[in-house]
Amino acid sequence: PQQATRWFDATADHPSTYCNPMNLSYCFRANLPDLVKNGSFRSTADPMMVMYKGEYFLFATNQAGFYYSKDLSNWEFVFAGFQRYPEDDDLCAPAAFVSGDTLFYTGSTYAGLPIWYSTNPKSGKFKRYVEKTALPSWDPAFLLDDDGRLYMYYGSSNEFALKGVELDRRDFHPISKIQEIMMLRPEEHGWERFGMNNDDSTTLAPFTEGAFVTKHNGKYYFQYGAPGTEFKVYADGVYVSDKPMGPFTYQKHNPMSYKPGGFVQGAGHGGTFKDAYGNYWHVATCMLSLKYKFERRIGLYPTAFDKDGVMYSNTAFGDYPLLTPKGKVDDIANTFSGWMLLSYGKPVMASSMDSTLVPENVTDESMRTFWSARSGEPGEWLQISLEGLKEVRAIQLNYYEHRAVQHNKAMDLYHQYRIYHSIDGQNWELVVDKSDNDKDVPHDYIELREPLKTRYLKIVNEHVPSGNFAMSGFRIFGNGLGEAPAAVKNLKVERSKADKRNAMITWEPVKEAYAYNIYYGIAPDKLYNSITVLGDTMY
């Protein structure tokens, strides 16, 4: 039977932190030849979230359902599939809004989809409010304004503008002229350019999609994703207006949600919502793009509006443990737990290795590399040395699907394991026991009940949902019990004379620093964007 330890008790697991990517039961993709030629994989994208009856409901692409949580950390899955044919999407880039005690829900369509509704969504049952929407709307988003008027924003294209329209709440038919809201201007906005580093001006024109509108202090903030979901620079920008249908003006600080570096990369095509305490959050799409270009995960980032009405998100340390809300936050820069990464580049051993999938891949801070054991059998293990006594506060286990045979959603998927620690590498003590776990936790995050001072950590497999025991990241967080690195010196920015949208940033290496955060913005007090650089002194 599963044991509680002084560091972890599965029956009383109420963490005060969470860690991106979000630990959701990501659905496996359908068994279609163009999707799975490199093997079965999980994915979702295009998330949005609403509060309904005091809980958070998260909707995202092709999940055969949705997720709900009371605390933004522990998530439960509800099966609510709408797929009609095996080759169809379930719901792509879904949209939802709440009116009174009713949750309304739909997905992307070029041919018309129902508008579903429910007053008990956790049952997974929905009724049809409208049999078929009147407009072909891909990537829809709704805004129910304070005056009761309903608006829809939509579009996904590298050729056409994103649009907005007012809808009749009785039948969801348009009752206004369809307005073109915005198009990309990559010639002016360098971050909107196509490519992994905004560096491809020849393959395709950049894409814009994922319209979403947030109303704050009487202003309408129109958010949009660009330049492509398969890139680490995928981000959300924002335009602002005094009216729900515009005209909208490009915000000087852009993109407002941006994360091109670190373990989790990409922060585009998302949605903004308020928590129970009035804090804003932005839930966004993260790139993985290993087995397939549209292989993706989801991240959740604190978001705010400054005294000048500038909308921004905080993605600095955005894939480290972040504090879950317990009240109103005065400054979203203070949502970082302070627990640093202890596992980057550290030595790793394993029970076995499948081909060239080496254990070192779990400590390189790349979600796009992974280690795999030769099997998924109980007893396969992975061990890390922290190269000295460290204070461990949290552990993130990023599983990867290697040789998996699962497709679509199944309700019998779960992970089971035990984690041990040792100071000398010889004598081991149980830290975390999830040998009875019945949840699917592909990015499991464990916050320890008290600090653990140790040198070695080992995870022993008991069960994986499908395929081999494989991981892209065995990430250990805490404190190194040493001195903090000194501040960076000799920071230089060289702007390209040929193209002022480009710049090279360099700095001197700092002893004992394993990574750097570059902060930048439109003013000294608005350095809202951050780029994490690991093991290098240039970007």
Where do the PLM segments sit?
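Beta-rich carbohydrate-recognition and catalytic domains
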Residues: Q2-T203, K215-G262, Y277, T285-D330, ...
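Recognizes extended acidic, P/S/T-rich segments that occur
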Residues: N517-Y539
